[in-house]
Swiss-Prot record:
It is an enzyme of class 5 (isomerase). Belongs to the RbsD / FucU family. RbsD subfamily. The active site is at residue 20. Keywords: Carbohydrate metabolism, Cytoplasm, Isomerase. Catalyzes the interconversion of beta-pyran and beta-furan forms of D-ribose. The gene is rbsD. This is D-ribose pyranase. The keyword Cytoplasm applies. It is found in: Cytoplasm. Homodecamer.
Amino acid sequence: MKKGTVINTQLSQVIADMGHFDLLGIGDAGMPVPEDTWKIDLAVSKNLPSFIDVLKNVLSELQVQKVYLAEEIKTENPEQLKQIQQLIDVPIAFIPHDQMKQDLSKTKAFVRTGEMTPYSNILLESGVVF
């Protein structure tokens, strides 16, 4: 049995496959995912698992150099933004939500959580450990 934090097979696989500058999306249950994007669906029920819990676990195993958030999170979900900022110690770029939806087609995968709060979506840009 895997000893690390992330034990979901698909999520572990995509994290291991990430290269420098690759993107991984994590988001709420309502985020529309392009048909050609690999969707790792972790949602069980409303807010289970939460966006923050999944983000914490992914950050424990993935080297991240930059993140992208929807500009709208600043006004529509400031509490979630505050929690994200407490976890992230890399540059944050704010982009329009519509741009984030388009950028999902550039990700290695999108991780769907059970989160039911608006604009709880993030794109993680992979860094290197050296």
